[in-house]
Amino acid sequence: MKIGIIGAMEPEVAHLIAAMTNTSSQTIADIEFIAGTLAGKDVVVTRSGIGKVAASIATTLLIEKYAPDAVINTGSAGGFVDSLSIGDIVISSEVRHHDVDVTAFGYEIGQMAQQPAAFIPAPYLVEAANKAIAQLGEVRAIEGLICTGDSFICDPVRTKTMLEHFPTMAACEMEGAAIAQVCHQFGVPFVVIRSLSDNANNDSPVDFDAYIVKAGYHSALMVMLLLEQLEPNSVK
């Protein structure tokens, strides 16, 4: 079993890379891919860069060059659930674009033309993530809708509009739906795991800078615990 792991920024992958053994790396299109062993599994970890285009490029290269059995997207997100605090975790129950609008042609808000409205993670990966939750100590985790767009959300007016469109949204970020869409088209199972770095409000820029390292650590810890739950025949 080989697992691809994608984070957008250095703090989101640094703990994973530091824990890897037997590593080798190559750089393609200015994106470094580090192969090795983590939690007893063969993995390839990459820092994609920020945003949907960067994430799509990295995911496509990862799948084409390394043929992973599954892809995990790890990192930080802005939170929309009152019961969660900075550092807590959202496991994707589904992933959607929040900045896509082709409703004039009969699609749902957030649905890209000729694509599903929501991208659904592999149940076995979500199950493994839920088993890992019990080992997280004081860190809380829930399953929920994660939405993606090419904007850092820190405007209450925009937040209100997003919640009108996606009332069950638990978190928003800038890569997950792009990664999910690429995985969908290649037929590769995926899951998105995000730790909250801010609460998508006026304080978000300050919160993000202060808490990105904490969020990156918690998300990386969740990924490593998830990997420990996977058996060689887990892929479905």
From Swiss-Prot:
Organism: Shewanella oneidensis (strain ATCC 700550 / JCM 31522 / CIP 106686 / LMG 19005 / NCIMB 14063 / MR-1)
GO cellular component: cytosol
Disulfide bridge positions per record: none
Name of the protein in its database record: 5'-methylthioadenosine/S-adenosylhomocysteine nucleosidase
Function: Catalyzes the irreversible cleavage of the glycosidic bond in both 5'-methylthioadenosine (MTA) and S-adenosylhomocysteine (SAH/AdoHcy) to adenine and the corresponding thioribose, 5'-methylthioribose and S-ribosylhomocysteine, respectively. Also cleaves 5'-deoxyadenosine, a toxic by-product of radical S-adenosylmethionine (SAM) enzymes, into 5-deoxyribose and adenine.
EC number from the UniProt entry: 3.2.2.9
EC class (word): hydrolase
Family: Belongs to the PNP/UDP phosphorylase family. MtnN subfamily.
Keyword annotations of the record: Amino-acid biosynthesis, Hydrolase, Methionine biosynthesis
Active site residues of this protein: 12 (proton acceptor), 198 (proton donor)
